């Protein structure tokens, strides 16, 4: 993980959480449901509508890949890398990008997964125009949805099965273990609450423009201002 104290991490993360949109949602207790169920954030519904992959499948996979305990519960964290089987989480996209460049000098791309859905750069990096873009949450999620849909189309009938293929196309124990994790994540979701039209419209706002919106919007996602190509 990014090297910093717990106090420093909290101070850096909390301002970001106040500006979330689309990809990190809230915890709710739905009528007739158990306590603490998560609603699926609108960004996942948006990508689902574009790709034909169920929003709950995308969100469960993202939770399985990059969960981080935040003040509003366990959520996927976009500034995540996995290198040679070890996970690293950073407080900003820039920190993750700088670390990625360093890792790329020491490891082959097939040992590096990036972003909110942990897309492997060696096998699927061709879907990104740059390594910086690979860390953009919506772009990363759309690529993940494309891979997940391909897995489903090759063996239709079960999105859980497709998730196992997403993680380990060769199948076997790694795929079975991963499917069990995705099932557990799926069980934490509130599938009865529909996403509103306003939330979908907010999710459609391009990332560079989201910092212009009121900062008290709970579902607002903001990208770091700086970029490095």
Question: Which ranges hold each PLM region?
Answer:
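N-terminal secretory targeting signals
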Residues: 1-53, 180, 184-229
